[in-house]
Regions:
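Active-site catalytic motif of lipid deacylating hydrolases and related acyltransferases
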Residues: 1-41
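Nucleotide-sugar donor-binding loop of glycosyltransferases
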Residues: 18, 51, 128
């Protein structure tokens, strides 16, 4: 998506930072960044996230009222990540290590919005073939959102390019 944005919409700010392991710090940093832009998030911001990033996108949308797209979003990350306390590697670069602390579990619990809101401003792309997360939980959590339920695929959404058009369409993005 970053390549498409750079090539077709360089007029739009594309921000895809490496987030810190602390969920509270990650969300606070993202909120600070958005506040620094001086925009109306409900009108001028869209957030896209996958897996834990989908959880963060849901948190940001609940706080800012912006449009958002989630791809195989983590629904209960506090529960699901509890077994990963300790040293981990990043998905993007297995040579990069970080430490996931037990203290991050209550941070995730505190961040979880009670409901997905604004649900009508959400697109959820959910793969039934997700090998890490239960697609039925995702489907139930994002009830009322625009949902694209995929037969097969996987957690990483390896066929992402096939769905880019749906994401761009939902966000009303066309080539400039």
């Amino acid at each position: 998506m970053g390549r498409w944005m750079a090539e077709h919409r360089p007029d739009i700010v594309w921000h895809c930072p490496q987030l810190p392991p602390s969920p509270a710090e990650a969300v606070a940093g993202l909120l600070d960044t958005v506040a620094g832009w001086g925009i109306d998030p409900a009108a001028d911001l869209a957030v896209v996230g996958s897996s834990l990033g989908g959880f963060y996108a849901t948190v940001l949308a609940a706080r800012l009222g912006c449009r958002f797209v989630v791809i195989n979003p983590a629904v209960e990350p506090a529960r699901d990540l509890e077994k990963y306390i300790g040293e981990q590697t990043t998905w993007q670069d297995p040579s990069e290590h970080f430490y996931f602390k037990a203290a991050f579990i209550p941070e995730l619990q505190a961040l979880r919005p009670a409901v997905v809101s604004p649900v009508q401003r959400a697109l959820a792309i959910i793969a039934q073939g997700d090998e890490l997360l239960d697609w039925r939980e995702m489907f139930a959590r994002y009830e009322g959102a625009h949902i694209k339920l995929l037969e097969g695929s996987d957690h990483a959404l390896s066929d992402f390019d096939e769905h880019l058009g749906d994401i761009l369409g939902f966000l009303e993005l066309t080539a400039a």
